[in-house]
Amino acid sequence: MRKKFKRQEYARYKKLGEKWRRPRGRTSKMRRYEKGKPAMPAIGYRKPSEVRGLHPSGYEDVLVSNMRELEALDPEKQAARIASAVGARKKTLMLEKARELGIKVLNP
């Protein structure tokens, strides 16, 4: 599970969101990496290159907008995400075809 980096003093002021912002204050303890203060993002928290960019299920996320693109997928490594431009009628046909081919659909 990824580490959640939160904004400095986000809990102290209601108007501050949790979204990460780099601390830039001159005397900021967080900026100076003092012990007992929240961690800041660093290159060491990066994911391993084998899983970087993959869907949490472990499949490569591929956007498909027609049957030909769906049939070209590798069911072992890739999962389909049906484009929003595809209508309901075509989407049901694509879902049936994906079930036949054993392809995982990320947005059924």
UniProtKB/Swiss-Prot annotation:
Give GO cellular component annotations, separated by semicolons.
Answer: cytosolic large ribosomal subunit
Q: Is Nuclease given among the entry's keywords? A: no
> CDD domains of this UniProt entry?
Ribosomal_L32_L32e (cd00513)
Tell me, which GO biological process terms does this entry list?
translation
Does Ribonucleoprotein show up as a keyword for this record?
A: yes
According to the record, the residues making up region (Disordered) are 21-44
Mind listing the GO molecular function terms for this protein?
structural constituent of ribosome
Compositionally biased spans, kind Basic residues: 21-30
Alphabetically sorted, this entry's keywords are:
Ribonucleoprotein, Ribosomal protein
Domain of life here?
Archaea
- Could you list the residue ranges that cross the membrane? none
- Output the InterPro entries linked to this UniProt entry: Ribosomal_eL32 (IPR001515), Ribosomal_eL32_arc (IPR023654), Ribosomal_eL32_CS (IPR018263), Ribosomal_eL32_sf (IPR036351)
**Family the UniProt entry places it in:** Belongs to the eukaryotic ribosomal protein eL32 family.
Q: Which NCBIfam families match?
A: PRK08562.1
Q: What is this protein called?
A: Large ribosomal subunit protein eL32
Q: Which organism is it from?
A: Methanothermobacter thermautotrophicus (strain ATCC 29096 / DSM 1053 / JCM 10044 / NBRC 100330 / Delta H)
